[in-house]
């Protein structure tokens, strides 16, 4: 299994990275985990979008799904689409089709008639125990964020990757990540910020320290930190994580790949 980072900037694109988007290659499977602002362009440096087998969206904030509109245009209007093209499976929160249609609709008046089902085959993450995608298995667990949000686990031939999506401290993330080879985990802010807070606000994001604590509690083999906003220092968040997690840990970088 191989993870390629399309974008890793937290809460929106930054000057050197798109927002969240991750390509997982496992055997013949090509799976996207999120597709935030700017990440569709990055995807095309690594893969023909027609070769995708599925998309899994952790939640529906724009920095994790805005470029689904671009993927729709590519698949619906490309003049040289494959003759065997089928609807692309999208695993996402239940309201994804309505939310994605709202982002794509030409106007508010046309929202009610905007239909994406000719291009995307939506599957509600809450309704599936495990999804099989071209020889990989995808599982999901609810996590703690202001909107409906999921962490995602991808398994293939004994290798396992867990992606936190966006979450505050959450037992569900620990359980889903238990024993995983790699935890790709958000670390959005420092554990303390003088003058702002002495402890992170609950139910939104993880600090670097909290990301490390979740990795340690789950017993993962390796921690990859992501989703660092441009206004915080990723190196400082990584140092926090390393204080509480004694396994390999690093910050991901756009266009970098990691073997699992």
Where do the model's predicted regions map?
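Binuclear metal-dependent hydrolase catalytic cores
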Residues: 1-162, 168, 175, 238-260
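Cap/insert and terminal regions of metallo-dependent hydrolase folds
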Residues: 169-258
């Amino acid at each position: 299994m191989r993870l390629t980072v399309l974008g890793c900037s937290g809460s929106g694109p930054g000057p050197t990275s798109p927002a969240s988007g991750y390509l997982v290659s496992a055997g013949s499977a090509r799976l996207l985990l999120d597709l935030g602002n700017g990440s569709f362009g990055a995807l095309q440096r690594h893969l023909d979008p027609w070769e995708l087998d599925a998309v899994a969206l952790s939640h529906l904030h724009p920095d994790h799904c805005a470029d689904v509109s671009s993927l729709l245009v590519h698949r619906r209007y490309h003049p040289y689409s494959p003759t065997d093209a089928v609807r692309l499976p999208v695993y996402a929160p239940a309201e994804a089709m309505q939310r994605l249609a709202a982002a794509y609709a030409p106007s508010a008046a046309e929202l009610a008639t905007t239909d994406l089902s000719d291009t995307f085959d939506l599957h509600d993450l809450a309704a599936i125990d495990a999804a099989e995608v071209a020889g990989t298995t995808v599982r999901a667990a609810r996590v703690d964020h202001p909107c409906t949000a999921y962490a995602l686990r991808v398994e293939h031939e004994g290798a396992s990757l867990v992606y936190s999506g966006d979450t505050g401290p959450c037992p569900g993330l620990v359980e889903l990540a238990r024993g995983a080879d790699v935890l790709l985990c958000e670390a959005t802010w420092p554990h303390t910020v003088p003058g702002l807070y002495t402890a992170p606000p609950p139910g939104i994001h993880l600090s670097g320290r909290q990301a490390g604590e979740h990795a340690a509690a789950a017993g993962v083999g390796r921690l990859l930190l992501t989703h660092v906003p441009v206004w915080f220092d990723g190196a400082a968040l990584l140092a926090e994580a390393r204080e509480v997690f004694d396994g390999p840990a690093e910050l991901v970088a756009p266009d970098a790949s990691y073997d699992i």
